[in-house]
Swiss-Prot record:
The keyword Secreted applies. Residues 1-22 form the signal peptide. This is Ocellatin-PT1. Its main location: secreted. The keyword Secreted applies. Keywords: Amidation, Amphibian defense peptide, Antibiotic, Antimicrobial, Cleavage on pair of basic residues, Secreted, Signal. It is found in: Secreted. Expressed by the skin glands. It comes from the Eukaryota.
Length: 66
């Protein structure tokens, strides 16, 4: 009976350790994804600002001709 208890304890312990390792890796992956999203947002903001400036410049040129 003691052998079964030790075996069960070992299986549960190893299962918890592997779960905690997987959980830690998952958190790291989520953090990496968040960093990528922030970089994408930064790039889109730059493109959006450049587009606004381009449209404003074009509208200024059109207004000068009229």
């Amino acid at each position: 009976m003691a052998f079964l208890k030790k075996s069960l304890f070992l299986v549960l312990f190893l299962g918890l350790v592997s779960l905690s390792i997987c959980d830690e890796e998952k958190r790291q992956d989520e953090d990496d994804d968040d960093d990528d999203d922030e970089e994408k947002r930064g790039v889109f903001d730059i493109i959006k600002d450049a587009g606004k400036q381009l449209v404003a410049h074009a509208m200024g040129k059109i207004a000068e001709k009229v």
